[in-house]
A protein has these predicted regions:
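Compositionally biased, proline/threonine/alanine/serine-rich low-complexity intrinsically disordered stretches
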Residues: 30-161, 736-760
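Hydrophobic alpha-helical transmembrane segments
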Residues: 222-230
Length: 760
């Protein structure tokens, strides 16, 4: 995301590709700090990664603070509310690549992070903490009342016994009803949403860290651009852009929650989530595609359905109206968020634009037809049944849509936190769930019957009954995760398919073959959306009759990356580049000062100015024929199209032990591991280390196709097109592998009662 049309980096000047802002990279997978791996551990900019210094006391390290400048109430997000700050002086030239004029008499900063103002002293307006200085204390932004933020280094743990809520928090809850309230009458829709990408949007530790890194590198001027899609409620509440989700309002944590769509009353269009939510408690009207005909029937029978429509009345609170809002059934409504265009003109995501120009749109198919229908990824009709269960009484049947929205993202966090589960929320707080060791088998007979009586559990889990209750909830969570994983496999298999294997040569002189990879959809490219960070790739492995590997492409380095130019092991010349790699991951290209371009993982320019800013462009890209700062090189497969992956096994690689066979795996992974190393400087939520995040991202990736073919001795074209049964088949492996319960160790295990943002 070169969100910044700024001065070119020092790295760009020399073209060496070194990253100025060093970032922590996850240790090699499967290695321990005491091991001697070969090849050597990854380094960044030639410097071995060092863990952050541990705190001097048992107090958790402070979470990375919110950006130093709170957003203003207007839309530009570039000017703080109070006090008014002087606008930065622009360069005299139009390309915005020149340095800012220095202050009279001030010398440039000598440090190389280029984030300090001139003179090398911290920005007085930013204070000692803030997003530019993540090790400093956390401060309450100016638009929050005193006492709203926890003390430095402490994230409060809310006990289940804390039933009292102050009046202000109660009002916030009323303005933005939680999905858990909607679940009372809409259990089907709630369950589908509970494990959806929409529900996970704000909980994702990868997203939150990426948002914070971008804001840090842009001196806070990116504002809420990214996060306002992920939690419109949180931004309406003026929450800090970057803070632990444990600090956020309950509805804010729900990401794209019920009211994000059903409390919108205007047709905004492609506004990158710059829309307004209608505020009000659960009694206020909702907005839906069908209007209020069924609701009127319910309201006309209050004795039957036991509903109330006025505050203070005894009964089941219900919204008083459903206002018919036709755009909810139109593709343009999805374009509110799914076309992401930055204020500087950079086109980051183009899912809706791709659809708008697709064959599917020309045929009259909508986004909702394929993504809310009976079968993920295909126009397959909709369900029919009661839209609500009011008490134990169903409402009259009508068209039903699927709110799962299965796609490429998946959860890497504790199953007590996600999927959303009302019983889990009632049993324990998020921080308490983080201390429940489900992988050790807590709450299972196998564990509890062998656990020592003196084992020291965290306070919330001292009771064996509570541990059994937690395990029962988690069993339901595991079921939900497998459910959405199956839907994810279906939609990925629907979109990306292996259609043919063309064997061109197989003799003593070598082996040549090609694989046809097709976009089987007509609605948009594959991948789409955030395609520059989607690690979709082919693994091709050729073995002889004895099982010895003679050729491999698409294999991973010890960090979990494939061997392209962004692999740290390739970058450091510890592994060769995979010249046969087939990947659908688009690339960010940044402009060098001499006019060339190079790939950059997170293309936020390292400005020559003391403080980089996100600024609107001063001229149209069409005038120059190129972006002045960065661009995205798309390698996605267009709708209904295909690409060939070509491979060649040299003569000297053959063993003479024919027949040879090739195994083809197509893998979809939500982000590459190298991105995690690039953004790790600000830490990850829930106390997760970069290695934990990287391991989970890799371990839960999907092998959507796995085919083995014995290579014939003569040239031939082999059809690999999958059947409908193949598309709908179960995944090759479970989504979440829970370790077998082991007897508890006899020594006490100390578990902190606070959960910090990790910098380790």
């Amino acid at each position: 995301m070169d969100f910044l049309k700024l001065s070119t980096s020092c790295a760009a000047i020399c073209g060496c590709g070194l990253v100025i802002l060093a970032a922590s990279l996850p240790p090699a997978r499967g290695q321990t700090p005491d091991s001697s791996p070969a090849p050597a551990p990854a380094v960044i900019s030639g410097t071995p990664v060092q863990p952050a210094s541990p705190p001097a006391t048992t107090t958790a390290p402070a979470p990375a603070a919110a950006p130093a400048m709170p957003a203003a109430s207007d839309d530009d997000l570039l000017v703080p509310d109070k006090p008014k700050a002087a606008a930065p002086t622009a360069s005299s030239d139009d390309d915005l690549l020149g340095p800012m004029p220095p202050k009279p008499g001030a010398a440039a900063s000598s440090d190389d992070d280029l984030l300090l103002p001139q003179g090398g002293k911290p920005n007085a307006a930013a204070g000692a903490g803030g997003v530019l200085f993540p090790d400093g204390p956390q401060r309450a932004p100016a638009n929050l009342p005193p006492g709203s933020m926890p003390p430095a280094g402490v994230i409060p743990v809310v006990s289940t016994g804390d039933a009292a809520i102050d009046h202000a928090k109660m009002l916030l809850a009323e303005k933005y009803p939680s999905a858990s309230i909607c679940a009372t009458c809409h259990p089907k829709q709630f369950r589908e949403w509970s494990f959806s990408q929409h529900a996970y949007a704000q909980l994702s530790p990868v997203f939150n860290t990426m948002q914070a890194t971008i804001d840090k590198r842009a001196s806070g001027t990116n504002g809420d651009f990214c996060i306002r899609c992920h939690t419109a409620v949180g931004m309406d509440l003026k929450e800090p852009v970057f803070t632990s989700n444990l600090n956020r309002n309950a509805t804010s944590r729900e990401g794209i929650t019920c009211i994000t769509c059903h409390r919108i009353r205007e047709n905004y269009g492609k506004v990158s989530a710059r829309f307004g939510l209608v505020q009000g408690d659960i009694l206020q009207p909702m907005y839906g595609p069908k209007g209020n005909a069924i609701l009127k029937q319910v309201l006309a029978q209050p004795d039957v359905f036991q509903v109330v429509t006025k505050p203070g009345e005894a009964g089941r609170a219900i919204h008083t109206d459903v206002v018919k809002f036709d755009p909810l059934e139109k593709s343009a409504f999805c374009g509110d968020c799914h076309d992401v265009n930055l204020l500087n003109g950079f086109r980051l995501e183009e899912a809706f634009s791709q659809f708008h120009n697709s064959p599917a749109n020309k045929e009259g198919t909508t986004c909702q037809d394929c993504h809310m229908g009976n079968t993920p990824g295909i126009k397959s009709g909709f369900g029919f049944g009661p839209a609500a269960m009011v008490g134990d009484k169903p409402t009259p049947s009508r068209k039903l849509t699927n709110h799962t929205f299965a796609g490429p993202d998946y959860s890497i966090i504790h199953p007590g936190l996600f999927p959303f589960n009302t019983k889990a929320q009632e049993l324990a707080s998020l921080a308490e769930w983080l201390t429940f060791d489900y992988q050790a088998g807590w709450g299972t007979d196998a564990y509890e019957k062998t656990a020592p009586a003196d084992f020291a559990y965290p306070g919330r889990w001292k009771s064996v009954d509570d541990r059994y209750d937690a395990r029962a909830i988690l069993d339901d969570q595991f079921s939900r995760l497998e459910d959405v994983n199956h839907q994810r496999y279906q939609i990925m298999r629907r979109g990306i398919q292996l259609h043919a294997l063309n064997v061109e040569q197989n003799d003593a002189g070598g082996i040549k073959f090609k694989v046809k990879v097709a976009n089987n959809t007509l609605g948009h490219g594959v991948p789409t959306g955030f395609d520059a960070e989607r690690a979709y790739f082919m693994q091709a492995t050729v073995t002889d009759r004895l099982g010895r590997v003679v050729f491999r492409s698409g294999d991973r380095d010890p960090n979990g990356d494939y061997r392209d130019i962004e692999s740290q092991y390739v970058h450091d010349w510890k592994l060769p580049m995979d010249k046969y790699l087939f990947t659908l991951q688009s690339k960010f290209l940044v402009t060098l000062i001499r006019g060339g371009e190079r790939v950059q993982i997170l293309p936020s320019n390292k400005s020559l100015d003391p403080l980089p800013f996100v600024r609107p462009p001063t001229n149209a890209d069409a005038l120059t024929g190129r972006s002045p700062g960065a661009r995205k090189q798309a390698v996605v497969i267009p709708p209904g199209s295909s690409r060939w992956a070509s491979y060649e096994v040299r003569r000297d690689q053959l063993t003479g032990q024919a027949p040879y066979k090739v195994n083809l795996k197509f893998i979809t992974q939500m982000v590459p591991v190298n991105l995690l190393g690039e953004i790790a400087e600000v830490g990850f939520d829930y106390g997760m280390s970069p290695k934990q995040v990287g391991d989970a991202v890799v371990d839960r990736s999907q092998t959507i196709w796995d085919k083995t073919v014995v290579l014939p001795s003569k040239p031939v074209m082999i059809d690999l097109t999958p059947s409908e049964a193949d598309v709908l088949a179960p995944p090759y492996k479970p989504f979440l592998t829970v370790a077998a319960p082991a007897p508890a160790a006899k020594q006490a295990v100390k578990v902190a009662d606070t959960t910090p943002l990790s910098r380790n």
